């Protein structure tokens, strides 16, 4: 009986060739190994730990709960390389009642080489919070999410780079980011929505049409969020949802165009109207920003009648000088969209208007004498 009790209360032990957890050194995985199990257990990669999955190596992470992490990475995981295959699979074979911890978590870095793949499959906890959190992820290979059922939870990546050879397909799983930088060179991103939390986020679009398979970018918080978008080629955003107290900054390279098909507020407990919202354009030039036809310019601001919301428009030139003028829309028949246009008074016309005003003021002063 005593031996049975001891067996019941023994902690889960990983039967694998990996060094004991936490990993605090470099380890090359070239065979087929596994961590985790369906009832619990955590494998940790410490800040000084480096796990290399090369030479056809496969690591399978199995879990059956998310009350705590199954894999925690605060170091570096390298999956595959340009000339060497590597695979990391995260799988839950059965459903379970969700907890509140990320299955894979940590502030470390995951690098997926050209012949590398990271796959999440099976049951993924479905709840309105983060079930995967990777601090830094660089993708030259493939990242795929293939859930066995619908998913409401988020795949959070704070700092992301997707190379020309890379692809990030999250399937039906929402993406999430906070206080980081996303550099997208190619391959693109496929997801229902990118949810942006409070703080500041930068998105660099370094190729054409990189977000055409991302259905929406949504600013979740109304406590103050800044999203910076640096656009280096023609790109389309299907839906851009913003909240109150949001600032959206655009820097669009000369000759490039950014199209936003739908520019709307986020549903905030059935309150759609948003206040204190600003769109800021740096190195602004006409012919660079286009949106749909359900918008007006009113009081020199962008007005969205469907949600009775005003967006302050601010523009700067290439030297950082504030551009003052009149905003308007011009219909672009080729794109079937509105082009946002800023008409800035010519210096000569401005000087003449200033001179006329000064003369009128002087004559008015004489008439009073």
Map each language-model feature to its residues.
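Extended, solvent-exposed polar beta/coil surface segments
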Residues: 53-54, 61-62, 68, 80
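Flexible "stalk/tail and boundary" regions
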Residues: 21-24, 31-39, 55, 71, ...
């Amino acid at each position: 009986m005593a031996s049975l009790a001891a067996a019941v209360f023994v902690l889960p032990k990983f039967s694998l060739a990996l060094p004991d957890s936490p990993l605090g050194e470099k380890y090359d995985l070239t065979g087929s190994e596994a961590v985790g199990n369906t009832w619990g257990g955590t494998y940790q990669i410490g800040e000084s730990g480096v796990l290399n999955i090369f030479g056809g190596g496969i690591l399978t992470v199995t879990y059956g709960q998310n009350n705590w992490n199954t894999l925690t990475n605060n170091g570096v995981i390298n999956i595959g390389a340009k000339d060497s295959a590597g695979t990391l699979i995260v799988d839950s074979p059965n459903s379970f009642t969700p907890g509140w911890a990320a299955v894979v978590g940590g502030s470390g870095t995951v690098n997926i080489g050209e012949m590398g793949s990271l796959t999440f499959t099976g049951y993924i906890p479905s709840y309105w919070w983060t079930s995967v959190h990777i601090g830094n992820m660089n993708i030259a290979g493939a990242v795929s999410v293939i859930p066995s059922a619908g998913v409401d939870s988020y795949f959070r990546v704070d700092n992301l780079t997707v190379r020309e050879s890379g692809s990030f397909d999250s399937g039906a799983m929402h993406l999430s980011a906070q206080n980081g930088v996303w550099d997208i060179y190619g391959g693109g991103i496929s997801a229902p929505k990118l949810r942006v939390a409070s703080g500041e986020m930068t998105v660099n679009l370094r190729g054409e049409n990189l977000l055409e398979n991302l259905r929406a970018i949504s600013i979740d918080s109304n406590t103050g969020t800044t999203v910076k978008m640096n656009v280096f080629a023609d790109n389309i955003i299907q839906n851009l949802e913003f909240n109150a107290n949001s600032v959206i900054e655009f820097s669009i390279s000369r000759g490039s165009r950014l199209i936003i098909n739908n520019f709307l507020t986020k549903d905030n407990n059935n309150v759609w109207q948003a206040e204190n919202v600003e769109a800021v354009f740096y190195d602004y030039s006409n012919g660079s920003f286009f949106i749909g036809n359900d918008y007006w310019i009113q009081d020199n601001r962008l007005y969205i009648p469907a949600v009775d919301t005003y967006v302050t428009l601010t523009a700067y030139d290439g030297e950082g000088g504030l551009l003052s003028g009149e905003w308007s829309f011009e219909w672009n028949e080729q794109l079937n969209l509105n082009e946002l246009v800023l008409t800035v008074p010519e210096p000569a016309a401005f000087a003449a208007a200033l001179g006329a005003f000064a003369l009128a003021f002087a004559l008015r002063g004489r008439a009073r004498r």
